[in-house]
Amino acid sequence: IYCSITGFGSGVGAAMPGYDLLVQAMGGLMSVTGPAPGEPTKVGVALVDVITGMHATIGLLAALNHRNVTGEGQEIEVNLLSSLLSAMVNQASSYVSGGVVPGILGNAHPSICPYEVYQTSDRPIVVAVGNDGQFAKLCQELEIPEVASDSKFATNPDRVANRIELNQLLVKQFLGNGADHWWKLLSNAGVPCGPINSISEAFALAESLELNPIITINQEGEERKQVANPITFSKTPVRYAVAPPSLDEE
């Protein structure tokens, strides 16, 4: 079994350099990412590289299964551009199925509302309302229950169509308290929400949830920490035999 990863395929685009930033730009991801129209922005990590690697892994596992059944090997090809187009899910399918070319919406969602970032009295919070029931609970906790029954906001399509007016009402209420207050209140009410954490806060959250996001490897008397494998197995737990080398070690 042989697997190759390229930037733009092994045919016409074989000579094109496959850098994550280039593919984020040329593959359309930056056109839907950023604070406002005219300000395309790259994702904060090399996400296209990661997604493509995962697609390659899926392909390899499928090929291994085929070989185990038939004894046949095969060649697998994955490219950054195709992986990105596949990973843009609803944005890509909107274009392919309906001819809609999506644009930048900042932190908003193109087809769900309210599903974005809201400023509170101290720091921003994310609210991800996925259905009408959650929206009614949100309005109840924000002490504006009449908004949930307003015909302009009664259903998700209504809320998307009247997004600007709705957000003005929500922001006014959110500014009345801090992010932690709203997080606790809304979460207890069943409204999906959460603060925008730093990397250190994100690791602390995972630790508090007993997800064990960091592992320590003792190598030659030295303890080295690294990010844990996110997959858990009931029969074959992940083993960490060797830590990554130190700078200039190899």
Model-flagged regions — what are they?
Residues 1-130:
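Active-site-adjacent "lid/gating" segments in soluble enzymes
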Residues 60-64, 143, 250:
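Non-catalytic, well-ordered alpha-helical segments in soluble enzyme domains
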Residues 84, 162, 201-205:
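Beta-rich nucleic-acid/ligand-interaction surfaces
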Residues 95-102, 205-218:
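Short, surface-exposed loop/helix-turn segments at secondary-structure junctions
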Residues 113-189, 193:
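Aromatic-enriched alpha-helical interface/lid elements that frame and gate functional surfaces
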Residues 116-120, 214-220:
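Short acidic-hydrophobic surface loop/beta-edge motif
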Residues 187-209:
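Conserved PLP cofactor-binding pocket of PLP-dependent enzymes
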Residues 218-250:
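Flexible, small-/acidic-enriched active-site or ligand-binding loops
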